[in-house]
Amino acid sequence: MQNSFFLKEPFVDILEEPKKNSNISSQLIYGESFKIISKKNNYFKIKTSYDKYSGFIKKIDSYKKFNPTHKVGILKARIYLGNKKKKSKKFLPFTSKIQILKRDQNFIMYKKDKWLKSKDIFPVQKKNSDFVKILKSFLNCKYKWGGKT
C-alpha cells in the first residue's frame, strides 16, 4: 500500500494492536503525514513520517495532497464553527499544520466551516527560539502516554 496521507482530524490515537482496547503508542495530529502499510479489519497499519512510529488507527478522514502554510503556536487552538464562528468544544493541538483557505477579521478558515483565531497560528517556517516560554506553557499539563495533545 505505502501511500502518503495527511490527517484531517484534530488528532487520532495510534494503537499497538488493531483493537479498541489496545494500548496507545502515540498520536497523529492535524496535518501530520503518515503512510498506510496495510489494512486489517476496520484498522489501518500506519507509520508516521516525522517520528517513524507505527501502529494501528481506525479509518479516518485524510488528505492525499496537502500544502500547509501555518502551524498552531499555542497548546490548544479552539475550533470555531460556521459563518457565526460559534465556539466548539474541539481544539487543534500545538504544532498542528494547517492551510489557510480564507481570512475573515481575526479568524482564518482552515477547513470548510472550521475556523481558528489568527493570533493562534504562525507561518510554518517561523521558529520560536524562546524555549523557556515554550517550556512554561507546558507546566501543569496532564501527561498522556504517547500523547501529543
PLM regions with names:
Residues 12, 54, 141-143:
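Flexible, active-site-adjacent loop/turn segments at secondary-structure boundaries
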Residues 22, 51-54, 114-117:
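Short, surface-exposed beta-strand-loop junctions and turns on beta-sheet-rich folds
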Residues 1-18, 27-30, 37-40, 47-50, ...:
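SH3-family beta-barrel domains
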Residues 9, 116, 138:
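Residue-level signal for pocket-adjacent positions within structured domains
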Residues 95-96, 117, 129-130, 136:
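Glycine- and small hydrophobic-enriched segments that form the cores of compact globular domains
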Residues 132-149:
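Catalytic cores of peptidoglycan-degrading enzymes
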